[in-house]
């Protein structure tokens, strides 16, 4: 993709407005339109970006429901931990390093297209395999029988159950991995990197809130479609369900192809003519030609700011993964207690999660909250997510602690902690889904906004590579560490019910929250200083490394 400041020699300057004029028009919107600060000249560009982001968000939201359904019905909640460690972590690391290698010779735009093409092919392949799954997949009971009636269930062998189940249901495992990779690579990394390179700092800041609204409309639509999917699924026989699943994946493949065509039109038609002349405050610095991944990591090792960004991503993902794992086990236990089909019972809470998340995020972005980073400060918005995480410890993990005490299945000291009574599974499940949703809401509306606004202040020379480190590597590392913790508790406590480890889980998350808050305070000072002086954020590294960042350039125009 061409850099946003290009082609300035191709068009007469008098035909192109300045960025300040565009900003003045966009910021003059009144009423509900003040939350869609898009100038008339930017309508087509924003519409194409919004449609792309909406499609990407819809696929991810629906895939999340599908992957949980496959795990609950075909495998066990504990297999999620195994998949995240032994499948997703190495795959994501390999793909992140592949992206870094490709950045040496290809643009972010080109890499984005390549990965979209790869996922489209994968979805088409899955759609075809569903039609012949019975002929090509191993017997559903190939490994399950080994763990029936206590077979191989000793403490030294029970941990292998998760591994065998992932092999027993390979298609379910592939669906789970593809959903995670689509979310982390395409949605969270490649599209946002593409957006970063397509916009100036001020344009990016205006586009992000309405784009978040669009992707949450997709989330709401996904929950609605999922509800219809589960109702239809109940009426169909097995083979008919296979045809339905095949159609869903083939349709998703065509949606990805549509994203590729929209991107091509955006670059070759809409962005062919520059939209405005970039002001000095938004002017990008020329990127250094060849920056290796090892060089990026070397500079990062000297940068307190990038280390802090990586740590907050790490702490969020570990904490979220621990809460999610506890929640999903609680859903399975409750489904068995109420004698309900696990896939349907899990799907109900997934839809509640998506409805709640989408509606609240849309409302927040149609309110003054969407500009709180600018009006109230980075620190206030940055602290929201760790505070919600702390509330999840008290209320959700507290309810899980109470239920394990009532079941007398918790740690010894926990079993006698509360007076006698019945387990409150409904309370635990609803606390769980509420805080799962709140963590997503604060991630999308606060955590990610702070991270992206700070990321836009990083020198463009290293921005994409650094983003792949703190979002790509540390994001997946956090999820995997959370999963490793789950497997360790699974083995150490000789149980498949991670709620037994609730006291340990709560203590670890609390320690993370303390360090998380300290990192946010540091990042806030750096961001506010950069905004105040209208410059790149100081990534807090040695003077020798800083010298390689500055390269002067002439004023340019933006696509």
From Swiss-Prot:
InterPro entries with a match to the protein in the record: ADP_ATP_car_bac_type
Compartmental location: Cell membrane
Highest taxon of source: Eukaryota
Membrane topology annotation: Multi-pass membrane protein
Gene Ontology MF terms: ATP binding; ATP:ADP antiporter activity
Glycosylation sites: 8, 196, 290, 403
Location of region: Disordered: 1-22
Residues annotated as transmembrane: 46-66, 79-99, 111-131, 174-194, 210-230, 242-262, 305-325, 354-373, 377-397, 425-447, 473-493, 503-523
Name of the protein in its database record: ADP,ATP carrier protein 1
Source organism of this protein record: Encephalitozoon cuniculi (strain GB-M1) (Microsporidian parasite)
Organism phylogeny: Eukaryota, Fungi, Fungi incertae sedis, Microsporidia, Unikaryonidae
